[in-house]
Amino acid sequence: MCTVSFISQGENYWITSNRDEHISRPSAHKPNEERIGKVKVLFPKDPKAGGTWFALKEDGAVAVLLNGAFVNHASNGKYAKSRGLVLLDIIASEEPFVFLQEMDLYRIEPFTLVLFHKKLLEFRWDGHQKYFKPLNPQENHIWSSATLYHDDVIAHRKQLFEKFMADTNAVSFEKILDFHSNNHNDFENGFIIDRETGLKTFSVTQVVLDSDGTTMRHLDLRNDRSFQVPFTSNQLTL
């Protein structure tokens, strides 16, 4: 929920997320398909609230959550619904981009959402106002959570990402997962963190969208397990 990258080459897309949480929080379940309303959604479920930070819908829509909007905020602990459940409401809707515009987010904690389905959108909710930023899906992007990283650290992580892309001739899911699974010699602010405060990178989750199909990979770093789950739907529309 704290680092997300979006990489595209032609009609191939790789979306990858690192989930950083306090060690008191339970690990997520492995990715499974669930029917939400009329659609199938594939996601790793957070057992605490039942939501998720990363979801893929049967038509190929992907939504990924980061905690916080533009700056670190003080949580008041009195919110109407978890952000992970909000994500599921959005991705399971018939038109996620439209639903997001109309959705009432009153008493929802600030968050950033990366939403992709043919179009790419960066959405931020700061607790008071919605911010929509359309992005070019033919370009590469990276996000870091404002709740965990200062601006200078976010800029440095972006530089690491840009260097990785410049040095990588042939992009593959393995190379991207390896990049996201590297602390880059920094346990405080690398892509894999292990802070004295108890904050730790729990997992790395990735969706690959290409002409050969759609696969979600989930690396459970806490329990040293990995899962590869192909989506069974034949309705994918890239």
Where are these regions (language model features)?
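N-terminal nucleophile
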Residues: 1-238
